[in-house]
Amino acid sequence: MYRTALRPSQSALRAIRSTTSPSALVSSGARRFASTTSAPKKKSTWKGAAVRWGLAVAAVYYYNTSPIFSDELPETAGTAPSQLTDADLPTVDAIVEEKRRQAAEHAAARKAAQAAAKAAATPATPSESVEEQITKAEAEAEAVPEGDSKPRSESTEGVIPEAGASPEALQEEADAQGAFNPETGEINWDCPCLGGMAHGPCGEEFKAAFSCFVYSTEEPKGMDCIEKFSHMQDCFRKYPEVYGAELADDEEAERASAAAPAAEGTPAKEEPVENKKEEALEPATHDATAANNNKKQQ
């Protein structure tokens, strides 16, 4: 029974050995490629070698320069912030002190602005009283020698007139100090010879009356300006705290003019019209000369 089973297996092994032997493989290969011929080998040229070397160099260069194959991360645009210490950080006390300092500065600036506004709004007041002006005038008159015939306007040229000066004296001082330009007809209201009266509460009335007197062509001078001087005096009475000295001069002039007719035995109502007109011509800054005349009459 076993012999009949081994015989077919031995015949199969022999067939496999015969097909896998080297001689069988060579013969089978010869039979398979008998109709074909081997392809001839092509000779390489220098152009192909140059192309191959160029491609190799380009690949190496791209590998070394491309960021794709780089191991390091690219640098960021911004730099890292520096480390802060505790000394650099502001404390609560420092912040409170800074706020207090700023508040004090704002308060000081506000007070300075208010003081400047008050100073600008306060009108200019005469710096000297009538008594001081009269005393100065008498001292100057005594200082001048008797034989000196030089006019007073020339000896006091360039000096600011007193607050009690008459319109004629103001005009002379204005002409001497260049406040009035006769060629152009302009009046410099900022001239110190006017005593700052053009910038007070009644500055407009003073400008109107003084300019009318300067440009007046009537005889006696200023006869056509009586109404304007009356308006100016009415304005002075509204501000007695500013023009108190000028109002006192006007009252003294009125008392002197009223006492003169009584001393002569004539009634006060018969006072000449010219005296009344001269009284109306007295501006805000006059009249020291009237006070001197009153003393001489007494």
From Swiss-Prot:
Q: Where is this motif: Cx9C motif 2?
A: 225-235
Bias-annotated ranges (Basic and acidic residues): 267-280
TM segments?
53-69
| Topological category with respect to the lipid bilayer | Single-pass type II membrane protein
Q: Which GO molecular function terms does the record list?
A: protein-disulfide reductase activity
Transit peptide, residues from-to:
1-33
Q: Where is the composition biased (Low complexity)?
A: 110-121, 256-266
Q: Which residues lie on this side of the membrane: Mitochondrial intermembrane?
A: 70-298
Please provide, in alphabetical order, the Gene Ontology terms of the cellular component aspect for this entry: mitochondrial inner membrane; mitochondrial intermembrane space
The entry's keywords: Disulfide bond, Membrane, Mitochondrion, Mitochondrion inner membrane, Oxidoreductase, Protein transport, Redox-active center, Signal-anchor, Transit peptide, Translocation, Transmembrane, Transmembrane helix, Transport
Q: How is the cofactor bound?
A: Cu(2+) or Zn(2+).
- Any S-S bridges, and between which cysteines? 191-193, 202-235, 212-225
Q: How does it assemble?
A: Monomer.
Please quote what the entry notes about the protein's domains. The CHCH domain contains a conserved twin Cys-X(9)-Cys motif which is required for import and stability of MIA40 in mitochondria.
Spell out the protein name for this chain.
Mitochondrial intermembrane space import and assembly protein 40
The species this protein belongs to is: Neurospora crassa (strain ATCC 24698 / 74-OR23-1A / CBS 708.71 / DSM 1257 / FGSC 987)
Q: What gene does this protein come from? A: mia-40
